[in-house]
């Protein structure tokens, strides 16, 4: 993952703020890899020295995400999930993001990587106890995420993207559903990048993703991806 190596070098030289947001080093990129090869460097690149950071869904995160996240040496890094996982350097909190157990404006930056699509759906694959399913759960979750983000703070979200579909344990977003999510957040969109898997990952347009399905185009998992960076407004009337 070349971009993560680039970020690591910036970290060691104290220059994380100048590293810049993720850009595909080549197209196609990550042939034979899942959407994680995009999401992880994209999310990590959004960190600009914030003190209090929350990662939602950390307990089931891959080591290839947790390792670079921890390498950022974030002063106060919290993890929220339905189950506990002991990770040195992360303050574990067990809870439901739809009822986040944090005060208003608690965090400078919140990361929600391939997690939002599972909220409100059948999570027994990750969590033994079945929760009540709620197709609007993601909208409730994003409102809570916005609430616990400080004004002027930022939110990073990645979700599978293409044709809207309920797969039972997660939903794939389309333009309409993602716009509803962003609207519910009440935040400003700083950046939105779309990607499609076609013998590797490439930048894509909305039109190119309209009919993309999960595991389509011989993808190992998602064949379409949306990465969004939001900012909570500084003023209540924005």
Where are these regions (language model features)?
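Class I SAM-dependent methyltransferase Rossmann-like catalytic core
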Residues: 1-50
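Class I SAM-dependent methyltransferase SAM/SAH-binding core
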Residues: 54-99
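A short acidic, Gly/Pro-enriched loop at the edge of an enzyme's catalytic core
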Residues: 98-111
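A short beta-strand submotif of the Rossmann-like class I SAM-dependent methyltransferase core
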Residues: 109-115, 121
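A short His-aromatic
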Residues: 118-123, 134
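A short glycine-rich, Lys/Arg-flanked "PGG" loop and its adjoining helix->strand segment in the class I
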Residues: 128-154
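Acceptor-substrate binding/catalytic loop of class I
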Residues: 136, 157, 162-181
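A C-terminal cap/extension of S-adenosyl-L-methionine-dependent methyltransferases
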Residues: 176-185, 190-238
